Swiss-Prot record:
One of its GO terms (molecular function) is tRNA binding. Residues 92-116 are annotated as: Disordered. This is Small ribosomal subunit protein uS13. Keywords: Ribonucleoprotein, Ribosomal protein, RNA-binding, rRNA-binding, tRNA-binding. Located at the top of the head of the 30S subunit, it contacts several helices of the 16S rRNA. In the 70S ribosome it contacts the 23S rRNA (bridge B1a) and protein L5 of the 50S subunit (bridge B1b), connecting the 2 subunits; these bridges are implicated in subunit movement. Contacts the tRNAs in the A and P-sites. One of its GO terms (biological process) is translation. Part of the 30S ribosomal subunit. Forms a loose heterodimer with protein S19. Forms two bridges to the 50S subunit in the 70S ribosome. The gene is rpsM. Belongs to the universal ribosomal protein uS13 family. The keyword rRNA-binding applies. Gene3D superfamilies: 1.10.8.50, 30s ribosomal protein s13, domain 2. Residues 106-116 have a biased composition (Basic residues).
Length: 116
């Protein structure tokens, strides 16, 4: 089982799909990583040679993924909350941040309906 960026990749999936199991890597980025590493997109992760795994690890290390990316996103939200911007206030109150209506919808963000 290939382990890249602290994530065990599924063995029976194509490497392009398996790379998307890493937080911060989507399908397009996975294709770019495979091309840069010189690995065919059709190869299964169980069939990777150790050299190919090392090349993929080196390419993935160039991106901000997993813990570093999660930390950066949470720090960005914390910064918005600390400076008291409109977006920070919306985060603090648990309301939609990007201008969506809240009269009828936004149940996911607001939580379960409170009975009066």
């Amino acid at each position: 089982m290939a382990r890249i960026a602290g994530v065990d990749l599924p063995r029976d999936k194509r490497i392009v799909i398996a790379l998307t199991y890493i937080y911060g890597i989507g399908e397009h980025t996975a294709q770019e990583i495979c091309a840069a590493a010189g690995v065919s997109e059709d190869v299964r992760s169980k069939d990777l040679t150790p050299e190919q795994q090392e090349k993929l690890r080196a390419e993935v290390d160039k991106y901000r993924v997993e813990g570093d990316l999660r930390r950066e996103v949470s720090m960005n939200i914390k910064r918005l909350v600390d400076i008291g911007s409109y977006r920070g206030i919306r985060h603090r109150r648990g309301l939609p941040v990007r201008g969506q209506n809240t009269k009828n919808n936004a149940r996911t963000r607001k939580g379960a309906k409170r009975s009066r």
